[in-house]
């Protein structure tokens, strides 16, 4: 039997582009724990591969996602006074070959892949 959620029945990766092109603020999410958070950047990669603007895809996993969750006063952009939770990638996280090499939580390095 099909285990898909009914609300996702017609979702494809070009849905992000179609909504974004119509001026809708799109947040790319993973529905963790159903699809783990580790796949968030892969979802952004797939959205770009299917036509979404790369800058909009990056915002969809950062600032727009924070805005849509009403927490953009704390996270989503790099600004003085916001939480210092940062992931450092080898390239844009919207590119398949990109790897997360460092993670900071509250300004403290918690992961450093060297």
Feature annotation, model-predicted:
Residues 1, 5-89:
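His/Asp/Glu-enriched, well-ordered alpha-helical/loop segment
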Residues 79-114:
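C-terminal cap of metal-dependent C-N hydrolases
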């Amino acid at each position: 039997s099909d285990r898909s959620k009914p609300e996702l029945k017609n979702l494809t990766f070009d849905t992000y582009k179609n909504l974004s092109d119509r001026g809708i603020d799109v947040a790319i999410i993973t529905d963790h724990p159903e699809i783990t958070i580790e796949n968030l950047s892969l979802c952004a990669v797939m959205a770009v591969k299917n036509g979404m603007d790369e800058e909009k895809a990056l915002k969809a996993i950062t600032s727009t996602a924070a805005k849509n969750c009403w927490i953009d006063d704390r996270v989503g952009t790099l600004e003085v006074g916001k939480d210092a939770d940062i992931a450092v990638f080898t390239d844009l996280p919207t590119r398949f070959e990109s790897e997360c090499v460092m993670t900071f939580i509250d300004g403290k390095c918690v992961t450093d892949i060297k």
